[in-house]
Amino acid sequence: MEFNFEPSNEKDILKKYSRNLNEEVSANKLNKIIGREQEIRRVIEILSRKEKNNPVLIGEPGVGKTAIVEGFVQKIISKEVPENLVHCVVYEVNLSSLIAGTFLQGEFEKRLNALIKEAKQNNGAVILFIDEIHQLMGMGKAGNNSGMDAANILKPIMARGEIKIIGATTSNEYRQYIEKDGALERRFQKILVEEPTPEEALTIMRGLKEKWEIYHKVRIQDNALVASVKLSERYISDKYLPDKAIDLIDEAAAKIKTEAHTSPSEPINKKIFYLETEKIALSKEEGTNQKERINEIEIELEKLKQERDLVEKEWKEQKEQQVALNKIKKEIEKNNWDVERYQNQGEYTEASKILYSVLPELKKKLEAIEKSISENKKVLIKDYISEIDVAEIISRITKIPLNKIFEKEQDKLLNLFNNLKKRVKGQDEALKLVSDTVLKNRVGINNPNRPIGSFLFVGPTGVGKTEVAKSLAENLFNTEKAIVRINMSEYMEKHSISRLIGAPPGYIGYEQAGELSEQIRRKPYSVVLLDEIEKAHPDILNVLLQVLDEGTLKDNQGRNINFKNTIIIMTSNVGALYLMENKEDMFERELKTSFKPEFLNRIDEIIKFNSITMEFAKEIAQKMLDDLEKRLKDNNYQITFDKSVVEYVAKNGYSKEYGARPINRFIQKTIENFITESILKNELIKDRSTIINFANNKLAILKSN
C-alpha cells in the first residue's frame, strides 16, 4: 500500500485554516459594531506594546467578545488606529479545521508551525484571532507522554513578541484551563468584558436594526427594541445582554417573515375544499333536498372563488411592494457603505456623488413605496415588529400569559393589598405589612442588594400563611407556579444541607445541583416558601443568613445564585398557642429560644397571623363555595348557593384550633357529596339555573329557569 502526501502550499495556509476579517469588514459582511469603545481601545493599547502584546477577552457567553474584535477590525479599515496597526490584517483561526484529519503524529504540529511561519513573515502585520482559546490546551497531543500541544508551541513565540494573538474565552474556561498553566497565562493580558447595561444594550440593538430589517424584510419599531431589552432582562436569566435581546428580535422577525409567506387565501381554500367534497357526496344521491343544497353550494362556491382571487391578487401586489421596498433599502445600505469606504480612502469626489446625487434619489423612491404601502385599504402582509410580537416570544418561552406581561407594574402594585385581601380573609394587618415591604422595594427605598422581602410567618395552622405566598406569586410574578416550595422537615439532619445547595467536591452527587440553588437559578423571579422552618437543622439556617443579608448564595459549583428578585417566606408554628391566648411575652420568649438572634435580625418582618373568628369563617366559606360554583360552571352546571348554605358550612366547619382547613373538608364531605348524588339521580341538570339552600336541617334544591 502506497501513501502519497502532497505538501500544502504555505502561501495559502492562512486562507485554508482561517478567515480574513479585514476582507469581510471591507465587503460589509459583518455587522457594524456600536459601543464597546473602552474595550476596543484596550485591545489597541495591548497590541501596540513591544512585549506581552497578546490580549485575551474574558467574559460570559453572549456579552460581545467576538464583536469587540470585529470592532477593532473596523477601526483598522477606517484608519482610526496608531501607525503600527494601520496595515495589520486580522485572521480568525479555525481550530477545528486545523486539527481535522491529523491522524499521524507530527501532522498537526507541521500545520500549526506553517501557520505561524506565514504570520511571522509579514513582519507583525498579521494578527491571529483565536476564539475559544482555551482549546489550545491539550490540542494536538499524540499521547500522555507528549507535551507538544498547541499551547506549548505558541508559548516561546508569544514570549518573543514574534506573533500577535487575540484570544477570547469565558471566565470559567479561562480559570479551568489557562490559569493552570502559569507560563501561558503571563503571556496574555486580560481584558474583562462585562455584560452591557440595558441602556448600552439598547444602543447596540439600534445599531443592528438596519441589518435585521434588510435580512428579514420587515420594519422593526423602536418600541420592539426597547421591549426586547426590558423583557429579556426581566424574564431570561440564564443568558446575557445583548445576546438574549438579539435572540428575541431575531425570532420575532423570523416569525413575521414566515407569516408573510403564508397566503391569506388558505382559510378560503379550505372552505372551498369542504363545499366541493359535500357537493360530490350529494350528487351521488337523488332527491329534491339534495338538489336544492347543491344549488346553494354552487352559489357559495362562486362567491368564495371570487373572494379568493381578489385576496390573492391583493396579496401578490403587496408582496411585490415589499420586494421593491427591500431592494431600495439594500441599495441605500450599499451606497452608505461606499460613502464611508471612499471617505476612508480619501476619494471625496466619489463620496460626494453618492451622498448628494444617488442617495437623495433612492430616498425619494423609498418614500414613494412606503406611501403606496400605507395607502393599502386592507393590509394582508404584516411588515413590522412591535413590542407585542416580542412579548409573544417571551410568553412562548416563559409560559406567562401575554396580558400579564403587559400589565402595568404601577397598577399591579397599587392593587396588591386589595388583591391579597380577596384571597386571604381575616389577616388584614399581616397583608398590609407584606404589601408595604414589597412596595418599598419596588419603588427603590429598600436596599437593592437584598431580596424583595423576607418574612417569617407565625401563627396557628390553617390561617392562610401558605395562601399568602401563593397569592404573592400570582400577583407579582404573574403565575401561582412561580413559587419554590421546600418542606424544611426534610432537612432535619446536618448533612442534608448538601441537598439544598449541592454536595461539595469529592462527595457523591457533586455533579447534581442543589434543590434550592438550581430552582432559583432557573426561576429567579419567584416566591421562596420554606415551610415549617423550625424543623430544619440549625446549621441549615446559617446558610440562609447570606441570602437574607446579601441576596446571593454560592452553590457547590461556585456559582453565585441571585436571590435579589425573590420574596423569601418562612412559615412556623412556634409560639402559635401563645398567640391564640394573646400571650405576647411568652410568644417572644419561645421565638428567641427557637431561632438565633442573627437569624431573626436579618428578617424584614415577623408577621403574626390571627386565629380565624366566626365572622371570617363565613367569608372563607363564601369564597370556597364561590370556587365550587366556578368549577361546576365549567361543567355546565349553573348552581348558586343560598346564604343559608354559607351559614351552615361556617357553623359546622369552623374550628378555632385548626383554622380554615376543616371548612374545606366539611364542604367536600357534605356539599360536594350532595351535588354528586343529585347529578347521578338527574335532580341537577346541565344548563339549568339551580339554587341550593339549607332548610329543616337538610340541603335542598330549588329549581329555576
UniProtKB/Swiss-Prot annotation:
GO terms for cellular component: cytoplasm. ATP 1 binds at residues 59-66. Residues 12-195 are annotated as: NBD1. Residues 409-611 are annotated as: NBD2. The keyword Nucleotide-binding applies. InterPro entries: AAA+_ATPase, ATPase_AAA_core, Clp_ATPase_C, ClpA/B, ClpA/B_CS1, ClpA/B_CS2, ClpA/ClpB_AAA_lid, ClpA_ClpB. Pfam families: AAA, AAA_2, AAA_lid_9, ClpB_D2-small. Residues 246-378 form a coiled coil. The N-terminal domain probably functions as a substrate-discriminating domain, recruiting aggregated proteins to the ClpB hexamer and/or stabilizing bound proteins. The NBD2 domain is responsible for oligomerization, whereas the NBD1 domain stabilizes the hexamer probably in an ATP-dependent manner. The movement of the coiled-coil domain is essential for ClpB ability to rescue proteins from an aggregated state, probably by pulling apart large aggregated proteins, which are bound between the coiled-coils motifs of adjacent ClpB subunits in the functional hexamer. Part of a stress-induced multi-chaperone system, it is involved in the recovery of the cell from heat-induced damage, in cooperation with DnaK, DnaJ and GrpE. Acts before DnaK, in the processing of protein aggregates. Protein binding stimulates the ATPase activity; ATP hydrolysis unfolds the denatured protein aggregates, which probably helps expose new hydrophobic binding sites on the surface of ClpB-bound aggregates, contributing to the solubilization and refolding of denatured protein aggregates by DnaK. This is Chaperone protein ClpB. It comes from Malacoplasma penetrans (strain HF-2).
